[in-house]
Amino acid sequence: MILRFVSKEGQFRLTVQPDSTFPELLAQIAEKLPKSVDLQSVTVSNRPQGGDARKISELKGVSFKQVGLSHGAQLFLGFEDQSTASNGHATAPTGANRLNGKVVEASDMPSVPLGSPTQVIKNPWEVVRQSPLDDKLDRQDGKIHRKRDARMCTHGPKGMCDYCMPLEPYAAAYLAEKKIKHLSFHSYLRKVNSAKNRPELGSSYIPPLTEPYYRVRPDCPSGHKPFPAGICTKCQPGAISLKPQEYRMVDHVEFASIQVVDDLINFWRNTGCQRLGFLYGRYEEYTEVPLGTKAVVETIYEPPQVNELDGISLGDWDNEKEIDEIAAQCGLQRVGVIFTDLLDADKGDGSVICKRHIDSYYLSSLEIAFAARYQAKYPRPTKWSETGKFGSNFVTCVISGDDQGQIGISSYQASNDAVEMVRADIIEPSAEPSVMLVQSEDDNEALNRARYIPEVFYRRINEHGANVQENAKPDFPVEYLFVTLTHGFPTQPNPLFTGGKFPIENREIMGEMPDVSALGKSLNAKANGLALNTTSGLNAISNFHMLCFIHNLGILSKDEESLLFKVASTHDTSEGSALQHTGGWATLLTILKESGERPPKRSYASPSFSATGRGAAHPGEKNRLMRQPSHGSDSDSVQLAKRLKGASLKGKE
């Protein structure tokens, strides 16, 4: 029979079977509506207004015959356009179901959300708000200016020729000369835009960036049943040809001070176990490469985790949103993750074993999948992509031993192909860290799910020097799935947080934890608190871990907390004076003063503690960038013995 449909876009007719259900018709309806329509919002009603409108997606199992529709019946459609949120995000679903209708248990869900489905946004350059840094780089010319060549240029001082004219930021000769391996994101954007949009052709503007999409498209216009019941060449992904990514979303990682990283390494020095932390900072322009971007790391927050000698297991992070909000009020955001992979060389000189090198691996397949999930969670909003987002600024840093036995940092990002292949569940980590496995559709029945795994290929240079294409199944090298970044420290450090030592959170395993006693000492509560109208007083409270602990106490009001975070990050004496005269600050000092200093907790020797001076500095390491703070003439083992001796004497008293 024929049904007539009326919407604000016009009228159309569809031929249906009486026993067909409403959701089965959604694909045919989508073909008649604009591409910007959110299919989950399409409603159907028997009246243009005032009728009982129902979402088609919710009418599962309801056939046209059941509701009394006959040949020639007229229905009215309503719908909304896809969300045009400022950053291109969409609300993630709160639950999920398997193909057989069984609810997916929470334990089976991925630990890190993979972001919203890819949806095309109409005129993204009008509705997407990107970061101020991206707006700034968009306005820049980006050309690489060159001086007049005295040997090759024959023109006058005001002339210009091929030897001195400005170069495009993606000029291959310049990048090779400066040994720049990857294009910056904005250089890559200029390159693809110049090829896709040519003003001389007079054609309409097309967003130059397109994110890879390796999943079966749910809104296929062919009219068949949704996958896995139906699939065609229009909705199935094509074969994937992997190649090294020529650009990177972030070019450089800058740590505000050595102490930021050294605090994380000290956990391994004291316990021998690995440690992970999230990087909080901001993004700035990086002038060492054309139109570059750098991540400036101001602090590292260590979430709840189980630490082992050879790995880390993340626990439930209950106050994750609160920490992100505190960072935001300090002008920071989460920019990446860092973790250690260190093994003492047992030489007694602080050296470590080099585990990651050209003959083993630099970033394991498991770490690439981990990085890809977080990059999917934090996409980069951009108005130059048809989906309103492209790639991610999230970086992954690894602290491990270098080829000289010293502790060094390496920075990486998973490629956009890797992120999408993880989203599509095409690849999975291997027990061999240097290779990534391609999933097999043969496992679908055992896993009670349906996946379409496209063909995956990669190109390599074979033993005869020829460039050949290889099938990636069952595994392929991980080098195709990540890009390397540079890193460093400023020559003149000017960190945002200038406070002294304060116990770092979630370190109970090594006997370190923030408490009111430590806070009272830091705020000098016995002497009625610090003078917050002085530079020294402001510097003392400028510690991110201290700010998080004060927030957890719940003593200050929201306005007082906001003022505290502002004072700690801006070091404004007038704001500090205002904070000192608030009622909440006075209450906090009174509580700390009345609580007094608690006696130190007894220290217990841990089997994982090393008595060999793990990671300690030795005379040849004075100029090392990553160094162990000096503890006088005593070694780590002597210091540990003294602490244990002092604890035992106090226990006898």
Curated annotation (Swiss-Prot):
Region Disordered, annotated ranges: 596-653
Subcellular location per the Swiss-Prot or TrEMBL entry: Cytoplasm, Perinuclear region; Endoplasmic reticulum membrane; Nucleus membrane
Record Pfam families: NPL4 (PF05021), zf-NPL4 (PF05020)
A single cellular component GO annotation: perinuclear region of cytoplasm
Recorded superkingdom: Eukaryota
Membrane protein topology class: Peripheral membrane protein
Major site of localization recorded for this protein: cytoplasm
The MPN domain, residue ranges: 253-390
A GO MF term: ubiquitin protein ligase binding
GO BP: any one term: protein transport
The family this protein is said to belong to: Belongs to the NPL4 family.
Record's function text: Involved in the import of nuclear-targeted proteins into the nucleus and the export of poly(A) RNA out of the nucleus. Has a role in the endoplasmic reticulum-associated degradation (ERAD) pathway.
Name of this protein: Nuclear protein localization protein 4
Top-level taxonomy: Eukaryota, Fungi, Dikarya, Ascomycota, Pezizomycotina
Gene label: NPL4
